Amino acid sequence: ASELEKIKLKSQLKLLQEGETGEKNILFELKNSGIDMYILHDIRLEDGDRSAQIDFLVVTRKLIFVIESKHLIGDIEIDENNGFIRSYEYYGKKVREGFYSPVTQNQRHLQLIHDVVMNHKKNAIMRLAFDHWFSDYYQSLVVLANPKNCIRNYSKDKQISQQVIRADQLISTIKKM
């Protein structure tokens, strides 16, 4: 392999390792929370041509949390239109780039969970009840696992502020809900 290919491969490997580190940090927080819960980690859900890789599905006595973990480098900004931007330095140069909304990504995960369950419930009353109460009992959280991240949230959407949190806020957020 060429030097450029080796550098790209090392970079991709480092990103994977950082992602794993972030998920381990979140798992540690969950396991040491003192809250009764079931923790399902790294779930792949498929329904026809749709699929989702869910980082954590956490079942507590009150709610079910679908958690998307992100271990990103740099400072994270959420603009007034709910766009996600990260800023970091790369070889002395400041880089500012947008990235796909993890909130939107996690909403897709929730929608797939909803659809899979609805497709497997045969009783009309159970389907109606599940559909009606789904958004009350299934909650989306995006957890930024890198402790060095600074979050600047300019979103006018209150839900965004409640859904995008740092790893050190995870347990207090779960307890409040």
Feature map (PLM): residue ranges:
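Surface-exposed interaction regions that form or flank ligand-binding interfaces
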Residues: 1-52, 89-177
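Cell-envelope/extracellular polymer assembly enzymes that use nucleotide-activated donors
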Residues: 55
